[in-house]
Amino acid sequence: MFKYKGLTFIALSFILLTTLVATAIPLLAQYYIDNYITKNIATAGLYILAGYYGLFILRVVFTFIGEYYFSKVAHSIVRDLREESFSNLQKLGMSYFDKTPVGSIVSRLTNDTQAVADMFGTIFSSFLNSVLMFVVTLTAMVSLSWQLTILMILFIPIMLGSVYLYQRLSSRLVEITRAKLSDLNTKLSESIEGMRIVQAFNQEKRLLDEFEGVNKEHLRYMSKSLAVDSLLLRPAMALFKILAYGVILAYFGLSWQTAGFTAGLIYAFIQYTNQLFNPLIELMQNFSVLQTSMISAGRVFELIDNTEYEPKQSNSDYKIEEGNIEFKNVSFSYDSKQDVLKNISFNVNKGETIAFVGSTGSGKSSIINLFLRFYEFERGKIFIDGVDIKDYSTKELRDKIGLVLQDPFLYHGTVESNIRMYNDNLTENDIEEAARFVDADNFIQELPDKYQSKVTERGSTFSSGQRQLITFARTIAAEPKILILDEATANIDSETEETIQRSLEKMRKGRTTIAIAHRLSTIQDANCIYVLDKGEIIESGTHEQLLEHKGTYYKMYQLQAGMMQ
């Protein structure tokens, strides 16, 4: 907030002016009543009356300006929070995303940051206005009748006790309600992202029932919060105000003749009592919003302060020139309890291709995750060109290692921007050459706007083969020394596979390649194939050697060959 001290100063200034004007209104009304109305010379007091309404107009104008600038500060703060949260999100390692639902992250970046904005824009300004109004009004009341002011002050501890009771009852409910809202967002996110599967397997009814269950849970706790609010907020405060009015009227009724109270003074004191209690009532009404905002702020700052960063790399000047790879006795566990990789060792020379095969959960993807430095490992060593992989800079690893995933991901934009990936060093000719190299140029040229054709979210308007070819072009445009192929042909139909395989062969030429294979037919020309089982290498050799061995690889090959027939 101090970052916007100029805007904050303007907002505070107008809040102070609003308070002073609000305090002056009852005094002017008292003067008008006692000096003009009670003396039957109301006509002469028209100027006073005009001033009275003028103060009301000033109060409205000052209130608007103060709230406008506070809202401006609030929206600037929420912008900064979202940028800071998203910036830190980019630095977090895969372990954070493994255990945190996407919907929960989205909820923190949208709903929770907006709740923080509400706190600064509405609650904070209301709090300052209430405190100033309380202090100035109390001073004015003392000047009118210090005895009655003391009686009014006696109500304050009772009201504060009500605030404390409300806080004790509602804080836990608010926290649970926000958690249920996060669950709701998570369920929505999962449902929308997996809509193809939902419809394909006729799961709409089950999904609707699950969503209704989560939604009802959210409603249940929201209803409990509203019940507490309805009991301890407006009704309780209204009761205290009525009791205070009764005390005022009784006091003036019993002592007006001896104390010399005037009608104007009585009117002013009632108005000031209103102004004294209204800030407390407003604070109570905003307390539930404040609690929600505080819990949301905690969730946002939990994300900002999260330090589960991706593994740190050295800032050295080491360069990947050849692409020789060595894994030496590497073991790894995601949960520090059960190893998913056990004593993995292998070598890949420049320009060679190796492949990993095995059942689901055998450790294939874990090897890739460690090599790409998505996770930190402590046992064993990984070398590139004889240099420990931890000694390379992150930029060097990202620049020299190209990744092609099983599920190609395209971003909203154009075909060109998806190949370029915001690398300004690439020219249009570089992009087209990369596309031609992987045989993507043919279908791109047939698009209405060619390389400027629009790409929707995840590239849903393209076939899986077309999406894969675009990601191939993206990888080749970066000119990597090492290629990682994570089951790049697993989701491709047989007709498209021929084009994909031809492109992959050209991509692999002269580059060190590590492939995870689902279809054994795609890696028969690999220099070495490693068979994994429960995190261990149980077989290795060329395609022919492994078939002759008639072990696990042979059985896998026979099974796939039988399925093909």
Please place each PLM-identified region on the residue numbering:
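Membrane-integrated ABC transporters
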Residues: 1-22, 37-48, 66-70, 74, ...
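Hydrophobic alpha-helical transmembrane segments of ABC transporter permease domains
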Residues: 13, 21-25, 62, 110-155, ...
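Transmembrane helix-loop-helix hairpins at lipid-water interfaces of multipass membrane proteins
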Residues: 8-62, 69, 142-147, 259-263
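An intracellular "coupling" helix at the cytosolic face of ABC transporter transmembrane type-1 domains
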Residues: 3-6, 94-95, 111-120, 124, ...
